[in-house]
């Protein structure tokens, strides 16, 4: 992992920790062994302690989010493999606006890391109220009296609703919750989380706009051919 991040020029300080079982290596994820995410402007890297693969998502200007895995068990000749169906089951459907995209969710989580889907979830971007963010994520850093769902595990499912997080705020040390030595950084910074949520949403918007433009240009060219017009003649329907 350190060698890969160094090659990609991604800083370990970008580390985020998510403990909900909501990724392809869900059997490796729990509040004691969260999945780590690292990112820069265009690349996202997912790492599970003792996982079989490192997960990568790249924001491609033409295709949108493109997904890869790097086999961690083959240290002599590591190979990065393109992934399609496995990742696009979640990252290419309605939850990413119908285009290959990135998905950030906030939900209630049981002590073993399983999401409690019967209680619903929030799809998170920069417009989501702070009080609804970070369910299933660790959050470190100071934020005053503002409430959020980070660092919170539902231990009593019979507790009165709505469930709230009244104690796990302004956390600076995660060493009592997980073995921080297994990760490249000790925390899951609140500022990095907010940048991540904004950036993934913008990447999805850019992908959606690009797909719409490509579809419009394809429609325009075919309509012009049918009308005997130059293929690049603008149509009102593609200029809206």
Over which residues does each language-model region extend?
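N-terminal alpha-helical interaction blocks
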Residues: 1-50
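Sequence context surrounding c-type heme c attachment/ligation sites in exported
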Residues: 46-240
């Amino acid at each position: 992992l350190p060698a890969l991040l160094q090659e990609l020029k991604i800083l370990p300080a970008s580390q985020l920790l998510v403990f909900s079982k909501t990724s392809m290596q869900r059997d490796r994820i729990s509040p004691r062994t969260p999945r780590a995410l690292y990112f820069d402007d265009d690349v996202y890297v997912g790492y599970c302690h003792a996982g079989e693969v490192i997960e990568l998502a790249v924001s491609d200007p033409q295709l949108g989010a493109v997904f890869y895995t790097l086999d961690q068990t083959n240290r002599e000749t590591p190979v990065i493999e393109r992934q399609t169906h496995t990742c696009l089951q979640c990252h290419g459907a309605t939850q990413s606006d119908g285009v290959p995209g990135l998905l950030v969710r906030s939900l209630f989580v049981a002590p073993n890391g399983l999401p409690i889907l019967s209680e619903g979830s929030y799809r998170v971007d920069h417009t989501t109220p702070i009080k609804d963010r970070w369910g299933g994520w660790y959050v470190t850093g100071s934020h005053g009296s503002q409430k959020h769902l980070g660092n919170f595990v539902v231990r009593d499912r019979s507790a009165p609703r709505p469930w709230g997080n009244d104690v796990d705020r302004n956390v600076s040390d995660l060493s009592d919750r997980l073995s921080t030595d297994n990760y490249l950084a000790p925390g899951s910074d609140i500022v990095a989380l907010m940048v991540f949520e904004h950036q993934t949403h913008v990447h999805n918007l850019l992908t959606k706009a690009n797909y719409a433009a490509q579809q419009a240009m394809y429609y325009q060219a075919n309509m012009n051919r049918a009308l005997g017009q130059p293929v690049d003649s603008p149509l009102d329907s593609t200029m809206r």
